[in-house]
C-alpha cells in the first residue's frame, strides 16, 4: 500500500493539490505545489523537503511515538519556502496546503476502501517571540488510541490555529 500511494502521489501531487484547493475555494501558489512534489515519502511518512537531511530521521522517530504504522506527516517550514513565494502570498497558504493534502489522501484512501483517516494534530513550532518564520506541522492517519485524537477546525484558516477544535473530511 505504501509503495502504491508513494508512486501515485509523486505522479499526481501537484495537480491534485491544486484541484483540492479549488474545491476549498482558494488557489495554492505554484511555489507550494512545486515544493510539495519534491517532498520525501519515507517509510510510510510523507515528509517535506528538509535541510539538513539529518532531521528526517529525527522527525520519523518523533512521529513513530505518536502515530500508527500508516500515517502521513507533513512539515512546511516557511524559511524553505521564502524564495518560492512572492510578496503577495498570505500565511494562510500554508494552512491551505495542509487541507489540500489531507483532502487528497482522505479521498484516495476512501476510494480504495481504507478506513477514513483523521487529522491527528497540528502545531506551530514557535519557541521564541522573535521567530520570523515558524514551522507548521500537521499529521493525519490512524490514531493508536482515543487520547491521540486531535482536530483542527476547518474554519481556522490562520497561522495561529490551535489544537483542540474539530475538522471533518467529507468524501
Predicted regions located by residue number:
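N-terminal leader/targeting segments
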Residues: 1-81
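A sequence-composition feature that detects small, non-aromatic residues
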Residues: 13, 21, 39, 63-64, ...
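Acidic, proline/glycine-rich low-complexity IDRs
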Residues: 96, 103-171
Amino acid at each position: 500500500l505504501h509503495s502504491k500511494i508513494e508512486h501515485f502521489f509523486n505522479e499526481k501531487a501537484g495537480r491534485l493539490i491544486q484541484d483540492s484547493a479549488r474545491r476549498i475555494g482558494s488557489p495554492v501558489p505554484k511555489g507550494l505545489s512545486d515544493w510539495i512534489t519534491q517532498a520525501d515519502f519515507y517509510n510510510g511518512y510523507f515528509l517535506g523537503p528538509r535541510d539538513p537531511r539529518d532531521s528526517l530521521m529525527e522527525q520519523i522517530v518523533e512521529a513513530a511515538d505518536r502515530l500508527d504504522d500508516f500515517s502521513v506527516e507533513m512539515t512546511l517550514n516557511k524559511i524553505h519556502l521564502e524564495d518560492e513565494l512572492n510578496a503577495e502570498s498570505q500565511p494562510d497558504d500554508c494552512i491551505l496546503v495542509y487541507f489540500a493534502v489531507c483532502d487528497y489522501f482522505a479521498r484516495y484512501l476512501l476510494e480504495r476502501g481504507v478506513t477514513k483517516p483523521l487529522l491527528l494534530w497540528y502545531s506551530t513550532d514557535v519557541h521564541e517571540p522573535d521567530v520570523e518564520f515558524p514551522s507548521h506541522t500537521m499529521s493525519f492517519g490512524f490514531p493508536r488510541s482515543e487520547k491521540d485524537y486531535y482536530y483542527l477546525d476547518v474554519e481556522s484558516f490562520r497561522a495561529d490555529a490551535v489544537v483542540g477544535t474539530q475538522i471533518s473530511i467529507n468524501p
